[in-house]
Regions:
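Periplasmic/extracellular loop-to-transmembrane helix junction in inner-membrane transport proteins
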Residues: 3-19, 36-78, 99, 244-253
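Interhelical loop and adjacent transmembrane-helix boundary motif
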Residues: 55-62, 214-263
Length: 287
């Protein structure tokens, strides 16, 4: 009887192992196919002229240089604001307001906001920033909308990173006479900086891939604006440009070229996040 049960368990374990292996292989094959397909369609259409010039309807040339700059402007503006607010809020909730009822309320609200479709953020951003505050359609309106979208993610990842720092580290620093802020600045933050940086890098990836919210707030102009005034002007990011080249102009080659650039950026960000995590993890183990 025992041998029969043992044989059934081995057969069941083997079957499940094979099924899980097939599922993993299919997932990997799908991702690999997607990467190869996009690159095979996009790389032949990449050129220095495409990357370094602005589009001109008079001469019939196509260029995405303004879209690249607009993407960089929005990423920089968004990440500067969202990191300041998100990390600051996480520090307050974890270190100063720990255990209070407001923490649970804010955490629940943050998790709820994370599940809202981005197009709703775009609609709210258009009504709030573009209309109510009179920013009109501009990169800064798009950046502020993306701040609201990514704030819950940065805040929650920072909170979880702060919680990984052992309480004994804080108590030891307090025992040496250090104040609350000094403990946070010199003990807590250095102990979880890898998680904070990783969360910020992954947020950059989400910002790069956003399009629906920016259609409502940042606009879709392909104009090369002045550096100091670009943030107050409308402009298309790479994702918005991809949509318009594919949907409106029928330029699928250019759309795939932009998709290749975005895919490469996302891959580099994921690699950077992995490198940061491994490096700081190695330093912690050495300590």
């Amino acid at each position: 009887m025992k041998q029969r049960l043992s044989g059934k368990r081995r057969a069941y374990a083997t079957t499940m192992k094979i099924l899980m292996g097939i599922a993993a292989g299919m997932a990997a094959a799908l991702v690999l196919f997607l990467i190869i397909y996009v690159l095979s369609k996009g790389l032949p259409n990449l050129s220095w002229q495409l990357l370094s010039t602005a589009p001109s309807y008079l001469s019939g040339t196509i260029g995405i240089w303004p879209d690249i700059l607009n993407t960089l402007y929005i990423v920089l503006a968004t990440i500067l604001i969202v990191v300041s607010l998100g990390v600051g809020a996480a520090i307050y909730l974890t270190e100063y307001a720990a255990g209070s009822r407001i923490v649970a309320v804010i955490e629940y609200a943050a998790e709820t906001l994370s599940g809202i479709p981005s197009i709703i953020y775009g609609l709210v951003g258009m009504l709030f920033f573009c209309e109510f505050f009179g920013m009109q359609t501009s990169l800064i309106a798009g950046a502020l909308t993306l701040v609201i979208m990514n704030l819950p993610t940065v805040m929650r990842t920072t909170q979880e990173s702060l919680k990984t720092v052992p309480q004994s580290y804080r108590e030891g620093a307090f025992g040496l006479g250090a104040g609350k802020w000094r403990v946070i600045r010199t003990v807590v933050l250095p102990g979880c900086v890898d998680g904070v940086i990783t969360g910020c890098i992954l947020s950059v990836g989400r910002i790069l891939g956003e399009s629906a919210a920016l259609l409502f707030t940042a606009g879709f102009g392909h104009v090369l604006n002045d550096f100091f005034t670009a943030i107050t002007k409308p402009g298309a990011t790479l994702t918005v440009a991809l949509y318009f080249y594919a949907k409106e102009d029928g330029e699928f080659g250019v759309a795939f070229a932009i998709a290749s650039i975005l895919m490469a950026m996302t891959l580099l960000l994921n690699i950077a996040a992995g490198v940061v995590t491994k490096r700081f993890g190695r330093e912690k183990n050495n300590e």
